[in-house]
Amino acid sequence: MADVSLKLSAKDIYEKDFEKTMARGYRREEVDAFLDDIITDYQKMADMNNEVVKLSEENNKLKKEVEELRLRVATSRPSDNKSFSSNNSSSSNNNVDILKRISNLEKAVFGK
């Protein structure tokens, strides 16, 4: 993610005092500069929020894929030794590939 340090806090915005000029107003340049800072901060927050939403959706997708692969592994296990011995090499290779994929997905999702 990009730089997430914000220049202003809610307290800074609330407590901001603008210097008054002799014409009973605020210096336009100071107000414009302050509003530019606010716009920059809010744009950063919007970008970060979009990134969080995107990552959350990707995380949910990967979790579903991990669960589907676990179910495939659980249902592909032979129920007795006879079928296991006849399909041992192909089933074993398939299960190893599935387990490797699950492991990689868990690392991606959970950071393990």
From Swiss-Prot:
<dbReference type="GO" id="GO:0005737">
    <property type="term" value="C:cytoplasm"/>
</dbReference>
<comment type="subunit">
    <text>Forms polymers through the coiled coil domains. Interacts with PBP1, MreC and EzrA.</text>
</comment>
<keyword id="KW-0133">Cell shape</keyword>
<protein>
    <recommendedName>
        <fullName>Cell cycle protein GpsB</fullName>
    </recommendedName>
</protein>
<comment type="function">
    <text>Divisome component that associates with the complex late in its assembly, after the Z-ring is formed, and is dependent on DivIC and PBP2B for its recruitment to the divisome. Together with EzrA, is a key component of the system that regulates PBP1 localization during cell cycle progression. Its main role could be the removal of PBP1 from the cell pole after pole maturation is completed. Also contributes to the recruitment of PBP1 to the division complex. Not essential for septum formation.</text>
</comment>
<keyword id="KW-0131">Cell cycle</keyword>
<keyword id="KW-0175">Coiled coil</keyword>
<comment type="similarity">
    <text>Belongs to the GpsB family.</text>
</comment>
<dbReference type="Pfam" id="PF05103">
    <property type="entry name" value="DivIVA"/>
</dbReference>
<dbReference type="GO" id="GO:0051301">
    <property type="term" value="P:cell division"/>
</dbReference>
<feature type="coiled-coil region">
    <location>
        <begin position="42"/>
        <end position="77"/>
    </location>
</feature>
<dbReference type="InterPro" id="IPR007793">
    <property type="entry name" value="DivIVA_fam"/>
</dbReference>
<dbReference type="InterPro" id="IPR011229">
    <property type="entry name" value="Cell_cycle_GpsB"/>
</dbReference>
<dbReference type="GO" id="GO:0008360">
    <property type="term" value="P:regulation of cell shape"/>
</dbReference>
<keyword id="KW-0132">Cell division</keyword>
<feature type="region of interest" description="Disordered">
    <location>
        <begin position="75"/>
        <end position="97"/>
    </location>
</feature>
<dbReference type="InterPro" id="IPR019933">
    <property type="entry name" value="DivIVA_domain"/>
</dbReference>
<feature type="compositionally biased region" description="Low complexity">
    <location>
        <begin position="81"/>
        <end position="95"/>
    </location>
</feature>
<keyword id="KW-0963">Cytoplasm</keyword>
